């Protein structure tokens, strides 16, 4: 079950690489499906969701949207996509970072120099307005950088964040596809039982976080969720026994959860302010 997560820059031909990998492996490209599901869950327009995920939403859109819920639900949708069917090529918001620690998932960045991307976009759009196209590319790059920094605390251009970085200035789309296929088919990325379990645990942790966000009892709680072979543990501090019990009760209702464990710490306010 090959899973490839791809991030790209505007004008880098990343969409073409994703499509080529999809066709070669006989697996779908997942992007619009995630947007559709999020729009339904958040009761927002698809265009609104896309701008929020891309970091290009206006101030009014940001103020009227629950961005915390959006990021939690987006993570759930992305990891669920990786778990379903016979594999997938997943494009877009945070997929490379959410899945980068999964042993059998190949995380790819497709890039190209700014001037190369600008020329491609001029040709694609059939325009000679180089300044406008350059501004659009810069805005897109800056928005993507801000989103990745805000949600994952990383510089998305750092090659160490990926298994494979492809510069399409001199490497053709076909060669990029071949490079990805070689990595996907290499022994290092073979799907094992242990690798599958890691991905299932990640998926379950995302489902638990989403369930906690949906429940009025736990919606505002900020805790760390860890999953090991279906066993869910919570870590954090500052919550009452009733609130901690609610965490375990909500998590226990998520399919696949075998047991829950409360590792929360109690803050002794009297000692702290004595």
Feature annotation, model-predicted:
Residues 5-19:
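Glycine-rich phosphate-binding P-loop
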Residues 35-87, 127:
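ATP-dependent small-molecule kinase phosphotransfer cores
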Residues 69-73, 88-92, 146-150, 216:
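Short gly/ser/thr-rich secondary-structure transition/capping motifs
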Residues 88-125:
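ATP-dependent NMP and nucleoside kinases share a basic, alpha-helical "lid"
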């Amino acid at each position: 079950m090959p899973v490839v997560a791809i991030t790209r820059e505007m004008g880098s031909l990343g969409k073409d690489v994703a499509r080529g990998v999809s066709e070669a492996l006989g697996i779908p490209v997942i992007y619009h499906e995630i947007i559709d599901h999020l729009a339904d869950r958040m009761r927002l327009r698809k265009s609104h969701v896309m701008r929020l995920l891309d970091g290009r939403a206006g101030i009014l859109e940001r103020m009227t949207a629950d961005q915390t819920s959006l990021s939690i639900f987006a993570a759930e949708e992305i990891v669920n996509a990786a778990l379903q069917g016979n594999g997938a090529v997943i494009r877009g918001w945070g997929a490379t970072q959410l899945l980068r620690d999964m042993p059998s998932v190949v995380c790819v960045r497709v890039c190209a120099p700014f001037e190369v991307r600008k020329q491609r976009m001029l040709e694609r759009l059939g325009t000679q307005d180089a300044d406008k196209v350059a501004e659009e590319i810069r805005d897109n790059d800056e928005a993507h950088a801000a989103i990745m920094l805000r949600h994952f605390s990383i510089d998305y251009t750092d090659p160490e964040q990926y298994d494979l970085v492809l510069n399409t200035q001199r490497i053709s789309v076909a060669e990029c596809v071949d490079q990805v296929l070689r990595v996907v088919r290499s022994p290092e990325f073979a799907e094992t039982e242990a690798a599958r379990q890691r991905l299932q645990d990640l998926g379950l942790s995302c489902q638990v976080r989403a369930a906690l966000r949906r429940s009025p009892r736990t919606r505002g709680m900020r805790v760390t969720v860890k999953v090991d072979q279906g066993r869910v543990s919570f870590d954090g501090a500052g919550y009452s026994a009733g609130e901690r019990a609610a965490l375990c009760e909500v998590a226990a209702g998520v399919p696949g959860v075998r047991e829950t464990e409360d590792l929360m710490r109690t803050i002794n306010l009297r000692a702290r302010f004595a």
